[in-house]
């Protein structure tokens, strides 16, 4: 069409203008400006909302060269042959001729090509390229953690949700590329460029609608899985999981309704004239914003490793890519409000941005955790445990701790779960007693297992430790709760009782042969067992400490002798001695612990005949050993009686009484009577206020061969009255003193015969003490 000037130009030549008008009179075309009003014969009035052109039907366009009007408002040179295929129903292709450049077809095609390349790059990262990790401060390639062994933590694995999501995005963008090329070629054949129509043709396809819904579902699930990894607490993981499932379900429902039921609505600009498209857009926006907020919160909490670290110089690049990928939904939400035309090609960027937000953030988190492990691997702290996590993770399949190891790893590996009291699948006690049985099982495991493993080390023979094939060194975790200490059998304090002579002590008596052969026997340990078989096997062993006083020495001596005999049998290296009657109950408990602990796994099985037969055989064998075990007679052993020391406060009372007597006596009488007492061999003390009182002590009977006089005898330990009373006062230091030996500490009539072992005696009841009578002097 040829443009025509509607208003006269004052600078134009009137002669040339008239000639041009006469030449174009037969085929006149008019350019109608925006805002013009057209009035039709039927009275209808049309207001032009955009520039238009009027062309008379008699104009022969095939013989003239006219410019073509493109959708962007510009004019390019060309022939009219490019518009010969237009029809009357193609007016919708020229709905907007003045779209800005950022909303035209060129940025849309470039954006689609760039996002497709990024999508395939993510797929290559997930499926082909090996992962990088930190190894001793150097970033290397590989698929393992810090070590390549079985104990290393693998950080190279990727969840399958990310792989499916990235692959679906790449497939979707490939289909969008094919549809865009087809629609652009059709517009090129028409000689026009309409970005809005191009976008509607591409996104309106049924195949792309279906693949987009599937891709979005896996994208949101992958992001939810990434969020679950960010937070270690089990409670937070559960909250994130169910919140994500609810939002993803609602988003899929409303997106499906918006794509198929409300397909006639505007797909390129969010003009929310109906509720379903608005809700679909709202749920998609909520998922993106929540994901971005939680990832930013995690990066702030881990700011020490998240943005820069000397061991990983490229951490800042990964951090920038992660932040950009998670902020894409927020940025385009702002652009949708301020510039709605951006939605034409912004959908592709948001599409691949959601995939990158999951893949790159996962890599970011793995690098942060690798730096944390590298820094804390030499620390002394253990795993971080939160309150309530053990109860939330409790299940019947995960009841036992530690978990059951492989069968081929040895007999010792299977014992980690045998002492917990559970069954083969972790213990059926969870269904019987609830979740609290997990705590009690863990407590019983740690209380019983170390005592059974360390028990052979307490024997007198070091060879006995190697007789058990199941005893192998293992590294166990510390107990969750400290074990309750065994009750200590402490004797009653004799000074706090009303009668100091009423306390009796029972001690073991050993012959000289036993002392020289084995030395001091180890104390008997009181071991408690939770299972029925072990409690029956060790019931007699525990009864030794709770027996009556009369039978306690015999039972203790019996257990001590049997323990020595068992140690001798173990040191010989022959396992046949384990079945002889001379084996002790402690060795039996130690050797039968692996077997009894294996039976604990099947204690709730009614049809486990093998376990029942083994338990019955163990019980009968213990009964036979109890019958054939020899006993020692400890009732006829010699007894030596040792008197109890004086009670607290008696010496002080006597001292005060002696001081009162000394101060009330007269000095002259004491001097005269003390001279007279030198020949009689008595110690005179003055008592009373007026008359002197003489106290004499009879000397004890002595042996016939003793010719030592009283003054020449070695000075024994003085009584508290003499030492702290009269002889420590400065007033009586010049008085002569005659020391009289103390009386014997036991009744000569009750003196026993010479014991077999003078070094070890038995304590008994204190007899009545006979002191010399005190008679006043005449």
Swiss-Prot record:
Q: Which GO biological process entries does UniProt record here? A: cellular response to pH
Name where it's found.
Cell membrane
Low complexity: bias regions: 749-759
According to the UniProt entry, which residue ranges have a biased composition of type Basic and acidic residues?
446-456, 588-605, 661-675
Ranges in the Periplasmic compartment?
130-160, 223-237, 297-314, 363-778
Give the Extracellular membrane side ranges.
1-108, 182-201, 259-275, 336-341
Q: Say where the protein is mainly found.
A: membrane
Q: How does it sit in the membrane?
A: Multi-pass membrane protein
Keyword Cytoplasm included in the entry's annotation: no
Please give an example of a GO cellular component term from this record: plasma membrane
The UniProt annotation puts the region (Disordered) at 394-499, 514-605, 660-778
Tell me yes or no: is Nucleotide-binding among this UniProt entry's keywords. no
Regions that span the bilayer: 109-129, 161-181, 202-222, 238-258, 276-296, 315-335, 342-362
Indicate the segments annotated as coiled coil, or none if absent: none
Residue spans of biased composition, Polar residues class? 457-466, 720-732, 769-778
What keywords does the record list, in alphabetical order?
A: Cell membrane, Membrane, Transmembrane, Transmembrane helix
Q: Which family does it belong to?
A: Belongs to the palH/RIM21 family.
Function, as annotated: Required for the proteolytic cleavage of the transcription factor pacc-1 in response to alkaline ambient pH.
This protein is called pH-response regulator protein palH/prr-4
Please tell me the species this chain comes from.
Answer: Neurospora crassa (strain ATCC 24698 / 74-OR23-1A / CBS 708.71 / DSM 1257 / FGSC 987)
């Amino acid at each position: 069409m040829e443009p025509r000037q509607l208003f006269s130009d004052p600078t134009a030549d009137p002669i040339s203008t008239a000639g041009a008008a006469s030449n174009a009179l037969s085929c006149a075309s008019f350019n109608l400006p925006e805002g013009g009003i057209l009035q039709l014969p039927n009275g209808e009035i049309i207001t032009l909302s955009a520039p238009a052109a009027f062309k008379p039907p008699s104009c022969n366009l095939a013989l003239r060269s006219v410019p073509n009007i493109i959708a962007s408002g510009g004019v390019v040179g060309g022939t009219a042959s490019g518009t010969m295929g237009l029809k009357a129903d193609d007016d919708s292709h020229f709905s907007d001729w003045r779209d800005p450049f950022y909303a035209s077809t060129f940025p849309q095609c470039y954006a689609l090509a760039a996002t497709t390349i990024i999508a395939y790059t993510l797929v290559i990262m997930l499926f082909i390229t090996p992962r990088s990790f930190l190894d001793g401060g150097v970033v290397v390639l590989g698929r393992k953690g810090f070590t390549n062994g079985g104990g290393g933590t693998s950080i190279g694995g990727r969840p399958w949700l990310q792989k499916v999501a990235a692959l679906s995005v790449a497939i979707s963008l490939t289909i969008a590329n094919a549809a865009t090329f087809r629609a652009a070629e059709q517009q090129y054949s028409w000689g026009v460029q309409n970005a809005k129509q191009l976008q509607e043709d591409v996104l309106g396809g049924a195949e792309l609608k279906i693949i987009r819904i599937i891709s979005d579902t896996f994208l949101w699930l992958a992001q939810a899985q990434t969020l679950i990894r960010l937070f270690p607490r089990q409670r937070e993981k559960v909250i994130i999981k169910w919140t994500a499932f609810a939002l993803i379900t609602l988003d899929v429902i409303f997106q499906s309704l918006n794509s198929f039921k409300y397909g006639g609505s505007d797909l390129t600009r969010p003009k929310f004239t109906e509720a379903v498209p608005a809700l679909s857009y709202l749920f998609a926006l909520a998922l993106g914003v929540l994901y971005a907020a939680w990832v930013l919160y995690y990066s702030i909490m881990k700011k020490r490793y998240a943005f820069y670290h000397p061991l990983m110089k490229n951490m800042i690049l990964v951090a920038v890519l992660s932040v950009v990928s998670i902020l894409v939904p927020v940025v385009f939400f702002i652009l949708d409000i301020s510039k709605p035309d951006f939605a034409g090609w912004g959908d592709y960027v948001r599409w691949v941005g959601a995939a990158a937000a999951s893949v790159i953030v996962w890599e970011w988190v793995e690098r942060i955790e690798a730096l944390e492990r590298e820094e804390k691997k030499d620390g002394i702290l253990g795993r971080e445990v939160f309150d309530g996590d053990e109860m939330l993770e409790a299940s019947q399949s995960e009841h036992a701790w530690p978990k059951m190891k492989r069968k081929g790893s040895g007999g010792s590996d299977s014992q980690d779960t045998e002492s917990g009291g559970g069954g083969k699948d972790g213990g059926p006690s969870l269904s019987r007693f609830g979740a609290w049985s997990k705590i009690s099982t863990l407590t019983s495991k740690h209380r019983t297992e170390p005592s059974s493993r360390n028990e052979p080390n307490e024997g007198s023979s070091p060879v006995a430790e190697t007789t058990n094939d199941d005893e192998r060194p293992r590294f166990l975790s510390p107990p969750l709760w400290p074990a309750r200490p065994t009750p200590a059998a402490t004797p009653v304090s004799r000074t706090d009782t009303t009668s100091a002579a009423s306390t009796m002590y029972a001690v073991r008596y050993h012959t000289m042969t036993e002392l020289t052969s084995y030395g001091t026997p180890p104390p008997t340990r009181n071991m408690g067992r939770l299972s029925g078989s072990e409690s029956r096997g060790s019931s007699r062993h525990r009864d030794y400490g709770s027996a009556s006083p009369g039978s306690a020495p015999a039972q203790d001596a019996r257990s001590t002798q049997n323990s020595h005999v068992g140690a001798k049998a173990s040191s010989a290296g022959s396992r046949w001695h384990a079945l002889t009657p001379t084996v002790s109950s402690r060795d039996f408990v130690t050797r039968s612990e692996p077997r009894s602990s294996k039976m604990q796994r099947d204690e709730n099985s009614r049809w486990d005949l093998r376990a029942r037969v083994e338990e019955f055989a163990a019980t009968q064998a213990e009964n036979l050993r109890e019958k054939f075990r020899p006993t020692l007679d400890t009732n006829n052993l010699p007894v030596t009686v040792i008197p109890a020391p004086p009670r607290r406060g008696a010496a002080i009372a006597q001292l005060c009484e002696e001081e009162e007597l000394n101060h009330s006596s007269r000095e002259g009488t004491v001097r005269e009577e003390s001279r007279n007492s030198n020949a009689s061999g008595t110690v005179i003390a003055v008592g009373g206020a007026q008359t002197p009182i003489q106290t004499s002590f009879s000397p004890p009977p002595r042996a016939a061969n003793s010719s030592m006089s009283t003054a020449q005898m070695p000075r024994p330990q003085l009584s508290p009255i003499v030492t702290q009373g009269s002889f420590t006062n400065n007033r009586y230091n010049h008085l002569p003193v005659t020391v009289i030996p103390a009386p014997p500490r036991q009744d000569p009539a009750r003196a026993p015969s010479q014991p077999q072992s003078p070094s070890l005696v038995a304590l008994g009841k204190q007899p009545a003490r006979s002191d010399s009578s005190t008679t006043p002097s005449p």
